[in-house]
């Protein structure tokens, strides 16, 4: 691959010494690295056996490989690299691929350093004689290769001109004229750039296609009968870069958009004068109605005054009605909230276990359940008929209580009417007595001395 010299061999040896540790860590197993070096007589049989024994004695493999590479450094030969980077080793040790590439790069860099200097310096020493484009530009891409009829055309040796891409050079070439008229953009150090007639015809066709899209205005070209003037104008159109064409197209689009916007604004103003949108409020509606009614009343001043008075009155009424509606809605919402709170509290009171209704109560029986607050018990009608001071109520614990004691147990001792404090089946004893379902004595409890 490379012409081997002493200098190159020395460079490879230095790189080998530099990469010994990397090579040692790239070898992750003993086979076939040790066997390859032994079979090619780079290491002796004794070193081969000692290396295997060291691996069996749990010496790190990378350290053993590094010792072998150090011994190969003493008698370094380029053939060592061929054996080290053989196909078998590269397949068994994938980490060696990157190291192999680094050695190959060393050879490339050495050849580039020792390559004879190019003749480009001699060409640059005499800039007056001119130079070719190929010596300055990098090698062109295949899709940008020049045609055969343009390869022989002379070019000017100008650093600014050569830095441009080949496509821009083709676009900026002027068209030939009967008399070689130099143009301001094409003169470079007293030399002109000729272009073939085919490119001139191609540019003429492209310009003729683009001309109908341009609007008539200040950008229109003034015609002249003289052939020289026509050639100058056509050459100037050819010299227009794509950036200038894009700028002109943007100007045309902006001009057309502004014109359309002006045409659209006029009917919008007319519509606003006749009909007002709902978002403009009551005042704009009043103005629209006033303008209509003034037209209907033949622009009489008296009618206008009457209409304005009526409209003002309507506007006031509308404002007052709106304020009243807002206040009503606010009161409704507050009333709903309060009503909701009341209903919730009423529901809570109805959920008291002493006030629940039970349709299965038989008032003809001598006993029926009663409640007073949180106290529950059983009322005996026969004992109640004897008097309020009699123990006629038996609580849940089985104790006999008088009406007053039962009120104390239910924390209703302060009630003025004990018949309203004691309930049965969700109704007070007063209500049951009025319905004829219960017979009670006088509302005040009798004293013991009576």
Swiss-Prot record:
Residues 143-154 have a biased composition (Low complexity). It comes from Mus caroli. This is Interferon-induced protein 75. The gene is Ifi75. The modification Phosphoserine is found at residues 175, 177, 226. GO terms for molecular function: DNA binding; DNA-binding transcription factor activity, RNA polymerase II-specific. GO terms for cellular component: nucleus. Pfam families: HSR, SAND. Residues 245-267 have a biased composition (Basic residues).
